[in-house]
């Protein structure tokens, strides 16, 4: 079983092979997702909402992410493991270096940061020091209070151009992957076509190189609000591993995301 690396994902992109990602927070679920063939696992700060019961991701700490990264690492043999850098853990280059090191030592293969031009120095610094970076644009949940809620981004021409420009700049700074969240499908397609690095979408249409969902949404166990872009695969399959397999297959076949999961 060959391990998935950022180079593997670049090959998938060049071959037009769609890949899948899921969040994971413990060894058992991570092992199930990994063994079924999920390519990327994210220890996401989404744990603040789906595990800890908060209304947003802001209370999550580096220690929280590091603990769950160690747990997930023990269940993973094949998938690329990304750890989220939580709110205010990368506000300065010095903080970024210290906290990214902690997450890599916990078992991550890559760290993920949210933001655009202001992050370029930190992305370059991490990359030059051997820490791979996944960038995140569009609806960045750590900025929810700036946005005034969980709202679609990039619908007007100026913001769409800004997001595209930031995507190109982050790639130039050394980012190896990019997540785009809750942006119009045409913008996500333009970004995917403009970059050589793989682009992973969530609520961003079917034209990105890969798709990511929160595991609780895929399994229909989220409490409260269910995002429009998600799909409950457990409901249609009745078994966790079958649900994961259905998600992988539908992404590979271009069935998911469908129009009802996409923003115009």
From Swiss-Prot:
Organism field: Shewanella piezotolerans (strain WP3 / JCM 13877)
Record note on quaternary structure: Homodecamer; pentamer of dimers.
GO BP: pantothenate biosynthetic process
Residues that span the membrane, as ranges: none
Catalytically driven reaction(s): 3-methyl-2-oxobutanoate + (6R)-5,10-methylene-5,6,7,8-tetrahydrofolate + H2O = 2-dehydropantoate + (6S)-5,6,7,8-tetrahydrofolate
One GO CC term, this protein: cytoplasm
Keywords on record: Cytoplasm, Magnesium, Metal-binding, Pantothenate biosynthesis, Transferase
Binding site for Mg(2+): 45, 84, 114
InterPro entries, per database record: Pantoate_hydroxy_MeTrfase, Pyrv/PenolPyrv_kinase-like_dom, Pyrv_kinase-like_dom_sf
Active site: 181
Annotated localization: Cytoplasm
This protein's pathway: Cofactor biosynthesis; (R)-pantothenate biosynthesis; (R)-pantoate from 3-methyl-2-oxobutanoate: step 1/2
Official protein name in the record: 3-methyl-2-oxobutanoate hydroxymethyltransferase
Binding site for 3-methyl-2-oxobutanoate: 45-46, 84, 112
